[in-house]
């Protein structure tokens, strides 16, 4: 029985709050920390049972790539599912190699003695079905054509991710989740778990998430979508077969996305009208580059090349 469901909005400022590190991670790895999960190896679960999507599309078989941290107890009920956001992946903690520049995206929160304590909990994070980090998705090979699925891959919904995660839980011998948690789109998955399978979830933690999008959310997403669709390298979603990548459209979409991640006040506090290049002098003909412009360009470029 679901015993708690917690919605958390905003970004806590307390140094002790684990939520502050939701999308953080060190850029340098001089030494793998002793209090982390260390080196981790992604695993792949193969499902040969046909999977029917909420929209009626059928996938004969599929794969889910995932990582685990900690050990599952004999009852199979000390497991925690971490659901990633739109730009996340299964790599939530630890390092894949000694020379990795940064750990998994929630490394500061997952590990021995950390808020998500791997000395007590068995932590699971999978790459969502339909994503491009190792689970079956548009860049996987369609067995019927021998080519990447591209735009022909079924369009998943949150319910589909939750159902595929339930299959993974059963595959791993998990009897129920001690908690399902995630932020943003990951938080929506946590909520969907509580709705669809309440007997499977003891605690639901949804961070910066809601049961549905507002009109403004939908509008910003539409602009971001059209930025990608308008890129000549999009090729109706079959860009891999065309030997192209819609990096310009993705970069612009990411810039739009970052406008929604901060409030107007937060953006003013962080950037103001500070210049990175140029000046306000009337006789200065050099291009002015505001710090906020540089920030958006950097985020767009970085995301589009991942």
For the regions a language model picked out, list residue spans one by one.
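Catalytic-loop region of hydrolases
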Residues: 28-82, 96
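N-terminal cap/lid subdomain of alpha/beta-hydrolase-fold enzymes
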Residues: 67, 72-142
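Conserved acidic catalytic loop of the alpha/beta-hydrolase fold
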Residues: 148, 159-178
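Conserved hydrolase catalytic core segment
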Residues: 178-215
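Alpha/beta-hydrolase-fold enzymes
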Residues: 206-303
């Amino acid at each position: 029985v679901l015993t708690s469901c917690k919605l958390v909005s905003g970004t806590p400022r307390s140094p002790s709050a684990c939520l502050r590190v939701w999308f953080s991670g060190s850029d340098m790895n001089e030494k793998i920390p002793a209090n982390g999960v260390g080196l981790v190896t992604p695993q792949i679960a193969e499902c040969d049972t046909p999977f029917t999507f909420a929209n009626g599309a059928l996938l004969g078989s599929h794969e889910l790539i995932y990582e685990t941290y900690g050990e599952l107890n004999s009852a199979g009920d000390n497991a925690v599912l971490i659901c990633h956001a739109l730009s996340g992946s299964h790599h939530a903690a630890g390092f894949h190699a000694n020379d990795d520049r940064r750990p998994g995206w929630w490394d500061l929160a997952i590990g021995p003695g950390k808020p998500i304590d791997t000395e007590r909990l068995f932590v699971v994070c999978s790459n969502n079905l339909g994503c491009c980090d190792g689970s079956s998705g548009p860049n996987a090979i369609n067995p019927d054509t021998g080519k990447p699925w591209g735009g022909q891959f079924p369009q998943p919904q949150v319910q589909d991710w939750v159902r595929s995660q339930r299959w993974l839980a059963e595959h791993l011998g998990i009897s129920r989740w001690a908690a399902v948690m995630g932020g943003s789109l990951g938080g929506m998955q946590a909520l969907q778990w509580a709705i669809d399978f309440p007997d499977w979830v003891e605690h639901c933690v949804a961070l910066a998430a809601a049961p549905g999008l507002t009109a403004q959310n939908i509008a910003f997403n539409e602009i971001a979508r059209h930025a990608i669709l308008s890129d000549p390298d999009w090729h109706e979603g079959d860009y891999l077969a065309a030997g192209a990548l819609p990096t310009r459209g993705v970069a612009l979409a990411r810039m739009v996305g970052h406008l929604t991640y901060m409030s107007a006040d937060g953006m003013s506090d962080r950037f103001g009208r500070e210049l990175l290049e140029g000046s306000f002098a009337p006789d200065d003909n050099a291009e002015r580059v505001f710090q906020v412009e540089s920030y958006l360009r950097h985020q767009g470029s970085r995301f589009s090349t991942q």
